[in-house]
């Protein structure tokens, strides 16, 4: 991956979770940003749900500002409701001779998404990101100590990432079933 000071042997881990922090799609890429990852992650999520026999598509997708692009908002067919905050940095248009910034193609989309996120429903939905995807990465990195990949090469590291995500789901399932009271045996 390209970094500030040259090139590093690094990867960009992607994951999609449910509201209960169950990982439904996981991928590893060598792209330095998330701009091109929304479409593949939506496809991986749809494939996982279809393989599990769940015909229902996701209703809302919450993503961070790294996924913000005109293409991600307009060119994905059958996309769920997207809540992606506009990028905080980047070109806002070159100043015109009269001093006002020129209008860019994304100004209307940016204003619409900002309004959607500023609404009460938008704020409530987007706040769920803090309790769905962020804890998953925190649990994998900090609690389980998986801050670096142990193997080399994209294929090997992708297998390791998917193994980490699978064991995360198994731990969720184990903790969920362990917290339930044991069924009482029937009298004979």
Where in this protein do the model-derived segments appear?
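Anion-binding and metal-coordination hotspots
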Residues: 1-188
